[in-house]
């Protein structure tokens, strides 16, 4: 390939010696001999120079549109150009490239590859893995390197058999196996589209997976029609235990229709519900953009978006910038000629670029070390390289193969952006979690296979016999149930003994409790004259204690007191009606059964059960005593001031307590404000739960409740026999609504209705109409009133659950805690945070105003000029060698203005120029200014666009002229609006003029000439100068012009001008210009006949106004 300098020094030495000998001895044939030596040296001298290394980029560029969108010629040219500018490369050699086409059929592709032998020094490719092995053998025979990103066979990694082959990317099979091993997915299926390249890819992939010991259930080929795809999907469903489906076809994200149709039909067949994982194969071969890169194909296709939730996209990681960003930067720097936008280019562009840079780096290493390079030495010197490719870091391992990082991308079935979930480190073959979990359909990963599939030196046989497995599972189930039943029986016996005897007993007697102060014997202390205070002794390091007034510990009996001391704490006894409780043993057994259900109820807003009192014929529930008494007492105590935050805190405590009880399947059945107690920390707790269950357990009949007691009971329970005692979940919600009414108005249930309780109960039982309390909006926020009405809905199924009530109630306080202590602290903190909130609010307002100002500034001035002005920099004038200007005005504008009101003139110009502004938005032009009826536009500045400026202005002019033909004035619809348009191309200077209301202005003779072209034009015509016509003709886009002749231009003399009358392919209708008079001109104003209709209509309106 390259020869070092050592042969030439010996030959030159020999040549000098022969010359001296011939001079000494006068040999006649020495001259002839020297000539022969020179002729022999010429080719060697030619080889001794730094000949270019020609890289052949081989692929199916002409037979597959998706491969042609990779723009291999542009990618190769960009890589060669950057290599030539890279100062780190040895300058003793250079690179060239040639684009070589693979045949579309694999059977013929090898033959075409052989024909390329003499066309390149080394090859990037092939892209078809079907003949990689044969191509690598030929490369070894030719001593030419094969650098491929697509080859699958792991045998190619054997450098003894294939010394001239190297991978520019990690083996796709290594990447797949690394991911499959991590998730324990062994059983795979491979499906390909019916293109020849993908069929051979699928066969190679399946063979490679099987060589790794993994079971590949099916290898299928599908056409693009629905019937073929459905048949393939049915075969996959019938295959045994397939977990992962590898799709060898073009990705749906870059326009692959086959994969799109395949995933849509899989979604219809419920195969994207998490049973299978779909993995696109082609994205393993390039870096698919995902950061800030939404995919419109997912946005516009809801079915595909939902199906893509089951797809894991594994692609080359791009750390700093995506492929689209790197391509756009190269295009902006002018390194890429005019080509499609980056989102229309295949990311395979970057892989081709990286492969060429890969060869250049290897060549550079070889030449620096040895001064020469062969194909085998290139592969050898590609080991342990590291360089930055097109948009990612490229690294190689000790064998010279690429070890780039990959990333696993995922969606949640609702978004159209991909998110990175795991990094696949191919250097260690490990996965690193990136913080965002994979969203699997159904909420859990696809079922894993046995670990033996990925264990070395182990053989998996595919599982045990199903019948044997069922027998084993059944036997284990019987054994497990037997063990659990025996354990449950033992546990019940032990618990029963412990609950009746010992420290955990729940059946209490007079020996366990001490009753105090007979004045506490009224209802739950609601009307008790308890006098106590909480004295905090935090400073002394002791816990708070209760201090009582003298005489508060007067001895009492169980007959006249409900308060007692149990284990040093105050407790409340809820007494049951007198009755026959039976034998003490039955009481013990029943108490044990009930406590099994109630002992685990531990919640901040549920008053805990401490046990049952049974002695001297009395049975009672023992619970904690709450010093603040019941909610009913607090509401009726005028000394307690309650704001809405205080009320909402109490209600939220009640909601949380009832939510907890309902989660534990406990129906309260007796929920009232007097059954809600408040402790010393103003924490509300629900009590008396389970009372009805205990009545049923003891088979006791309850006294008939009074009408006042029934005001909290739901209507359906009032109407149902025995409903009051049974209760229901929906009935508890209704009772909560009545308590809400009590808290809001601080009054009894239905206190505003002014009716006796009995009549209220009768109306509740017999609707219509539905009878409910009436609460004024001034008592609570509208959201709370609405929630209360939902809770007391007549139909029980329409009432919300406490989970829904809790979620709604949280939003009323905007997520703030409603605990009383927290509320007090928040009030104190609010003063200190007010200033911060005010500053933040003002800062946000300032930022919004700044954005508005910047937006207005960029609408008035070019972006680059606006940025300079914002930075306080001086905007230097800028010269433009060639731009095209557009001028237009309204024919007869003076006459129209004279016949119109000022506001009508403003409306006319606003309507017309709004229409123009909408049109220029679709062209590469810049609106300079409007003065009166004059409209000025330029193209080619401030952003240069080559020679396109004339075409952009011409296209815009045709669009404007077409739109004006149908434009009507609001106040003069009968009068036509005609415009004259003038176009001219030439140099201008642009700059910002003035400090007050600065404007971006254009200067130069081109501006004057363009204005003259407009003023000398005719209505409904586009007057074009020779310079503009010349540019349009060079563009060869089919513009139709007519020669006007020589025209007198003020200050310019006479010049030859033209009319622009259309363009090939332009189908919009153009207005017909007025006829030209005998003098070759038309009027520059409105004709009397044109305004006669308007004058006649105006006179008629005046007559109507003057009529009495």
UniProtKB/Swiss-Prot annotation:
Q: How does it sit in the membrane?
A: Single-pass type I membrane protein
Q: What is its main location?
A: membrane
Spell out the Gene3D superfamilies in the cross-references: 3.40.50.2300, Nucleotide cyclase (3.30.70.1230), Transferase(Phosphotransferase) domain 1 (1.10.510.10)
Q: Name one GO biological process term.
A: detection of light stimulus involved in visual perception
Provide the membrane-side ranges marked Extracellular in the record: 51-469
Q: Where is the Protein kinase domain?
A: 532-812
Q: What InterPro entries does the database record attribute to this sequence?
A: A/G_cyclase (IPR001054), A/G_cyclase_CS (IPR018297), ANF_lig-bd_rcpt (IPR001828), Cyclic_nucleotide_synthase (IPR050401), Kinase-like_dom_sf (IPR011009), Nucleotide_cyclase (IPR029787), Peripla_BP_I (IPR028082), Prot_kinase_dom (IPR000719)
Taxonomy, superkingdom: Eukaryota
Database matches in PROSITE patterns: GUANYLATE_CYCLASE_1, GUANYLATE_CYCLASE_2, PROTEIN_KINASE_DOM
Q: Where in the cell is it found?
A: Membrane; Photoreceptor outer segment membrane
Domain annotation Guanylate cyclase: ranges: 884-1014
What controls its activity?
Activated by GUCA1B when free calcium ions concentration is low, and inhibited by GUCA1B when free calcium ions concentration is high. Inhibited by RD3.
Q: List the disulfide bonds.
A: 104-132
One example of the protein's molecular function in GO is: protein kinase activity
In its record, the post-translational modification comment is: There are 9 conserved cysteine residues in sensory guanylate cyclases, 6 in the extracellular domain, which may be involved in intra- or interchain disulfide bonds.
- Summary of subunit composition and partner proteins: Homodimer. Interacts with RD3; promotes the exit of GUCY2F from the endoplasmic reticulum and its trafficking to the photoreceptor outer segments.
Query: What's noted about domains in the record?
Result: The protein kinase domain is predicted to be catalytically inactive.
Family (UniProt): Belongs to the adenylyl cyclase class-4/guanylyl cyclase family.
Please explain the role this protein plays, according to its UniProt record. Answer: Responsible for the synthesis of cyclic GMP (cGMP) in rods and cones of photoreceptors. Plays an essential role in phototransduction, by mediating cGMP replenishment. May also participate in the trafficking of membrane-asociated proteins to the photoreceptor outer segment membrane.
What is the recorded name of this protein? Retinal guanylyl cyclase 2
Q: Which organism is it from?
A: Mus musculus (Mouse)
The protein's gene is named: Gucy2f
């Amino acid at each position: 390939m390259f020869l070092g300098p050592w042969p030439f020094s010996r030959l030159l030495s020999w040549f000098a010696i022969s010359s001296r000998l011939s001079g000494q001895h006068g040999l006649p044939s020495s001259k002839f001999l020297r000539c022969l030596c020179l002729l022999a040296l010429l080719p060697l001298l030619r080889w001794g120079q730094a000949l270019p290394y020609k890289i052949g980029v081989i692929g199916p560029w002409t037979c597959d549109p998706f491969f042609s969108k990779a723009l291999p010629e542009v990618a190769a040219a960009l890589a060669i150009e950057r290599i030539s500018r890279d100062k780190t490369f040895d300058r003793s050699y250079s690179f060239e490239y040639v684009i070589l086409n693979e045949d579309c059929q694999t059977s013929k592709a090898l033959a075409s590859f052989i024909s390329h032998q003499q066309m390149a020094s080394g090859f990037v490719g092939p892209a078809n893995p079907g003949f990689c092995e044969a191509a690598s053998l030929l490369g070894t025979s030719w001593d030419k390197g094969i650098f491929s990103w697509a080859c699958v066979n792991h045998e190619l990694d054997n450098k003894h058999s294939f010394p001239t082959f190297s991978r520019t990317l990690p083996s796709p099979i290594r990447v797949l196996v690394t991911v499959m091993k991590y998730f324990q997915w062994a059983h795979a299926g491979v499906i390909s589209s019916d293109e020849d390249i993908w069929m051979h890819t699928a066969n190679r992939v399946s063979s490679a997976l099987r060589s790794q010991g993994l079971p590949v259930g099916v290898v299928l080929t599908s056409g693009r029609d629905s019937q073929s795809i459905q048949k393939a999907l049915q075969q996959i469903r019938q295959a045994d235990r397939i977990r992962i489906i590898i799709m060898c076809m073009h990705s749906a994200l870059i326009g692959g229709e086959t994969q799109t149709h395949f995933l849509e039909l899989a979604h219809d067949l419920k195969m994207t519900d998490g049973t299978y994982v779909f993995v696109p194969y082609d994205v393993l071969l390039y870096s698919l953009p995902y950061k800030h890169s939404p995919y419109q194909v997912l946005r516009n296709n809801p079915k595909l978006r939902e199906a893509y939730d089951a797809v894991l996209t594994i692609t080359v990681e791009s750390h700093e910038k995506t492929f689209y960003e790197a391509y756009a930067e190269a295009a902006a720097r002018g390194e890429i000629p005019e080509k499609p936008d980056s989102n229309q280019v295949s990311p395979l562009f970057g892989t081709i670029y990286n492969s060429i840079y890969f060869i250049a780096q290897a060549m550079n290493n070889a030449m620096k070390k040895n001064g020469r390079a062969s194909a085998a030495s290139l592969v050898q010197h590609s080991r342990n390289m590291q360089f930055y490719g097109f948009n990612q870091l490229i690294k190689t391992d000790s064998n010279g193969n690429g070890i780039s990082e990959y990333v696993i991308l995922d969606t949640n079935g609702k978004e159209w952006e991909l998110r990175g979930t795991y990094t696949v480190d191919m250097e260690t073959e490990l996965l690193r979690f990136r913080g965002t979990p994979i969203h699997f359909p159904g909420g859990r990963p696809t079922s894993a296979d046995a670990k033996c599939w990925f264990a070395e030196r182990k053989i998996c046989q595919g599982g045990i016999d199903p019948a044997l497995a069922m027998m084993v599972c059944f036997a284990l189930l019987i054994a497990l149930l037997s063990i659990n039943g025996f354990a449950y029986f033992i546990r019940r016996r032990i618990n029963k003994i412990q609950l009746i005897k010992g420290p955990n007993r729940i059946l209490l007697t007079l020996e366990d409790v001490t009753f105090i102060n007979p004045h506490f014997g009224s209802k739950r202390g609601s009307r008790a004259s308890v006098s106590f205070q909480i004295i905090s002794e935090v400073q002394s390091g002791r816990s708070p204690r209760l201090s009582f007034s003298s005489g508060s510990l007067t001895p009492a009996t169980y007959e006249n007191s409900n308060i007692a001391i149990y284990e040093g704490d105050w407790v409340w006894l809820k007494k049951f009606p007198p009755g026959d409780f039976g034998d003490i043993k039955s009481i013990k057994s029943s108490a044990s059964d009930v406590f099994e259900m109630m002992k685990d109820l531990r919640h901040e807003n549920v008053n805990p059960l401490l046990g049952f009192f049974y002695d001297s014929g009395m049975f009672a529930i023992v619970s904690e005593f709450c010093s603040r008494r019941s909610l009913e007492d607090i509401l009726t105590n005028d000394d307690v001031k309650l704001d809405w935050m205080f009320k909402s805190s109490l209600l939220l405590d009640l909601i949380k307590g009832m939510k907890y009880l309902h989660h534990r399947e406990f129906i309260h059945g007796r929920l009232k404000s007097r059954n809600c107690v408040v402790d010393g920390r103003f924490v509300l707790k629900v009590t008396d739960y389970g009372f009805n269950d205990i009545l049923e357990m003891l088979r006791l009949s309850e006294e008939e409740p009074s009408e006042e007691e029934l005001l909290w009971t739901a209507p359906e329970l009032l109407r149902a026999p025995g409903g009051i005692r049974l209760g229901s979940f929906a009935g508890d919600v209704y009772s909560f609504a009545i308590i809400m009414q009590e808290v809001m108005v601080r009054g009894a249930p239905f206190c505003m209705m002014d009716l006796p309780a009995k009549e209220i109960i009768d109306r509740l039982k017999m609707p219509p109409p539905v009878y409910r309390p009436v609460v004024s909006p001034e008592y609570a926020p509208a959201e709370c009133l609405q929630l209360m009405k939902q809770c007391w809905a007549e139909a029980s199924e329409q009432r919300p659950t406490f989970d829904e009530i809790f979620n709604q109630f949280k939003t009323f306080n905007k997520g703030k805690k409603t605990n009383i202590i927290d509320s007090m602290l928040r009030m104190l903190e609010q003063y200190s945070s007010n200033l911060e909130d005010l500053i933040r609010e003002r800062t946000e307002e300032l930022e919004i105003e700044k954005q508005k100002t910047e937006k207005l500034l960029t609408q008035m001035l070019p972006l680059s000029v606006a940025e300079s002005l914002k930075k306080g920099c001086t905007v230097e004038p800028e010269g433009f060698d060639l731009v095209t200007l557009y001028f237009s005005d309204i024919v007869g504008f003076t006459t129209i203005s004279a016949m119109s009101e000022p506001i009508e003139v403003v409306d006319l110009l606003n309507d017309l120029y709004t229409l123009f502004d909408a049109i220029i938005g679709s062209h590469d032009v810049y609106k300079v200014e409007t003065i009166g009826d004059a409209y000025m536009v330029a193209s080619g500045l401030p952003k240069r666009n080559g020679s396109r400026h004339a075409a952009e202005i011409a296209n815009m002019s045709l669009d404007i002229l077409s739109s004006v033909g149908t434009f009507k004035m609001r106040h003069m619809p009968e009068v036509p609006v005609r415009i004259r348009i003038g176009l001219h191309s030439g140099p201008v200077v642009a700059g910002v003029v003035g400090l007050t209301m600065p404007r971006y202005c254009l200067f130069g003779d081109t501006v004057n000439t363009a204005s003259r072209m407009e003023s000398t034009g005719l209505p409904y015509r586009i007057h074009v100068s020779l310079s503009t016509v010349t540019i349009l003709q060079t563009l060869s886009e089919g513009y139709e012009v007519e020669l006007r002749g020589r025209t007198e231009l003020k200050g310019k003399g006479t010049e030859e001008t033209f009319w622009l009358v259309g363009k090939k392919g332009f189908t919009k209708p153009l207005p017909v210009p007025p006829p030209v008079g005998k003098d070759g001109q038309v009027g520059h104003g409105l004709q009397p006949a044109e305004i006669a209709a308007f004058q006649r209509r105006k006179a008629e309106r005046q007559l109507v106004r003057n009529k009495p």
